[in-house]
Design a protein with these regions (language model features):
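Basic, flexible linker segments flanking DNA-binding modules
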Residues: 1-68, 173
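Hydrophobic (often cysteine-bearing) scaffold residues that line and stabilize catalytic clefts
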Residues: 2-6, 20, 52, 56, ...
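Mobile genetic element proteins and their domesticated derivatives, centered on retroelements
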Residues: 9, 24, 28, 60, ...
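RNase H-like two-metal-ion nuclease catalytic core shared by retroviral integrases
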Residues: 45-47, 51, 144-146, 152-153, ...
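An active-site-proximal beta-strand-loop segment
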Residues: 62-110, 116
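Active-site beta-loop-alpha junctions of metal-dependent nucleic acid enzymes
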Residues: 94-95, 112-136
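Short small-residue beta-strand/loop micro-motif enriched in glycine and branched aliphatics
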Residues: 106-112, 166-169, 193-194
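Charged, gly/pro-enriched flexible loop segments at helix/strand junctions
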Residues: 211-217
Length: 217
């Protein structure tokens, strides 16, 4: 794939063979296959507003490995930009927000929502779908950063009511949720980089199609 970077190629090849990431990097370099680096602002939405509710312990503690599906789930919100004409015919920058829930077992996106506003309703839509998928498992953990939408009682109580343990990254430490950061990097490199979208519907459809491709590739 022309937009795949070293890490993505290594991950794909590792499914069928043993290969060192350094060797993958060397082969890419020798054959001049390196993709153009993604330079756009990462678009990660900073929803941290201090402690506005309950901050959970960092139970995951960067241990993203699990031998069963639907046991360790993580989430976050990221933004994408598109352009839309106003009444004067001038293009205005608009934003779209993606709220995915990712299974750490295989990095599959088990649910997501796409919205024009980064509010709790958007998160709740994806959360409800994720819980429906993981409800038959025991000792399930849902991880996130300390964003305000994950601290509020409605989110915390929904997890409790469904027997789900909540885990949160430490403040300002993106590596505590690097598995989700990696997905955001991949989707923006492969679907969003060097492309311009001119409506909410166009960008929304591109995200939907990409997540399907990502999950089924």
């Amino acid at each position: 794939h022309e937009d795949w970077g070293c890490k993505r190629i290594h991950g794909y090849l590792s499914k069928t063979m043993k290969i060192n990431i350094k060797k993958v990097h060397r082969i890419i370099k020798e054959n001049n296959l390196q993709v153009e680096t993604y330079h756009k602002k990462n678009g990660k939405l900073n929803t941290y507003k201090g402690t506005v509710g309950k901050v959970a312990d960092n139970i995951i503690n960067r241990n993203f490995k699990t031998d069963k599906a639907h046991k360790k789930i993580t989430t976050d919100t990221t933004e994408f930009k598109y352009y839309e004409k106003d009444k004067s015919g001038n293009y205005q920058t608009k934003k779209i927000y993606l709220n995915p829930f990712l299974d750490m077992f295989n990095s599959e996106i088990i649910s997501y929502s796409i919205n024009k506003r980064p509010n709790y309703k958007a998160v709740e839509e994806a959360l409800d779908k994720a819980i429906e998928i993981t409800k038959d498992q025991k000792e399930v953990i849902y991880h996130s950063d300390q964003g305000r939408l994950y601290q509020i009682p409605r989110y915390v109580n929904t997890l409790k009511e469904n027997g789900i343990t909540q885990s949160m990254s430490r403040k300002g430490n993106c590596l505590d949720n690097s598995i989700m950061e990696n997905f955001f990097s991949i989707i923006k490199q492969e679907m969003y980089n060097k492309k311009v979208f001119y409506s909410f519907e166009e960008l929304e459809q591109a995200i939907i199609e990409y997540i399907y491709y990502y999950n089924h590739k």
